[in-house]
Amino acid sequence: MLALKLSVYSVVFFFIAVFVFGFLASDPSRTPARKDLED
């Protein structure tokens, strides 16, 4: 039962991380400060 719970938590955390990363990476126009730092 513990392994099942850990696997579910890991999958949920993975999807949340992918969603947050994709949201930040696909939205460079709303973060001009990061664009200035890259220069």
UniProtKB/Swiss-Prot annotation:
It is a single-pass membrane protein. Signal peptide: none annotated. GO terms for cellular component: photosystem II reaction center; plasma membrane-derived thylakoid membrane. Pfam families: PsbI (PF02532). One of the components of the core complex of photosystem II (PSII), required for its stability and/or assembly. PSII is a light-driven water:plastoquinone oxidoreductase that uses light energy to abstract electrons from H(2)O, generating O(2) and a proton gradient subsequently used for ATP formation. It consists of a core antenna complex that captures photons, and an electron transfer chain that converts photonic excitation into a charge separation. PSII is composed of 1 copy each of membrane proteins PsbA, PsbB, PsbC, PsbD, PsbE, PsbF, PsbH, PsbI, PsbJ, PsbK, PsbL, PsbM, PsbT, PsbX, PsbY, Psb30/Ycf12, peripheral proteins PsbO, CyanoQ (PsbQ), PsbU, PsbV and a large number of cofactors. It forms dimeric complexes. This is Photosystem II reaction center protein I. The gene is psbI.
